[in-house]
């Protein structure tokens, strides 16, 4: 087992990474301060792991709330089901909410914990690669709004993150690839040697090689923890973690939540960010193509939805958390391994990026 730390002073917390950690309740017990525990899961994950986790927490009074699965249910109506479960079970301020599932469950359970009786303890047990390397670390919680993704939420840090890599053995291949989009992101924004490692090991990752997966998760979480420790509330460097997300969130919102997986939209959105970075002369076309090839090898889409027009993108991108005083800030690559957040770009370059021939780029070999 590997343990990392998110350093936030008195609110610091550990990230435990290893195989079989669901069967080690001693990793969770120190972070549960009352008798009551509420496990929040979904209809896909609960049959696989809920009973096992409940057994390992036998010393506590455990209730569970099982939600419908999917991004389409990340909304007010589903959030109310969590509050209904907590109130029906008469859970008080010393309850601990545990998220058992992927990013949607983690975001909603965390937001519920932030709101319930003005804040209760919260634990993350992510079961998808995407949630293990990204959404479970850093305290971003929330729900979607019909007009924009993740526009309603709070920063609310967990007490501990428990990553059992064995849970990836039950993850569908499409979901695994979606998680690889966020892994690749770390190489692009801050760790070019990791990007090279990913190029050498992407096939092993897709084949569920436990050694490769554990290393990729550790390196991704270490990068995320360092950024969050330096900028918890995303006022500066943390925004670079959103590479591809402004374009990607536009895709998710326009196509309908859940039609494209988050990681799939991030992959296509990152290709657009690479294209814009190349058009600005910050990276070469060869470097852009390097990123595209890696996403393709990871089984991810690199062509945005062809039915989306430039106007569609601009409409959705105008409702983005990085918009400040009406200016759209974008995360782009100054070079491979170095990202910047900027609103200093010619409008014509953004327009050309939105209108680029991504189908032609996807055919490039090298």
Swiss-Prot record:
Has the keyword Cytoplasm been applied to this entry? yes
| Obligatory cofactor(s) | Co(2+); Zn(2+); NAD(+)
What does the record's cofactor remark say about binding? Answer: Binds 1 divalent metal cation per subunit. Can use either Co(2+) or Zn(2+).
The EC number of this protein is 4.2.3.4
Which superkingdom? Bacteria
UniProt xrefs under SUPFAM superfamilies: Dehydroquinate synthase-like
List, alphabetically, the HAMAP family matched. DHQ_synthase
Name of the protein this chain belongs to: 3-dehydroquinate synthase
Organism field: Pseudomonas fluorescens (strain Pf0-1)
Q: Which gene encodes it?
A: aroB
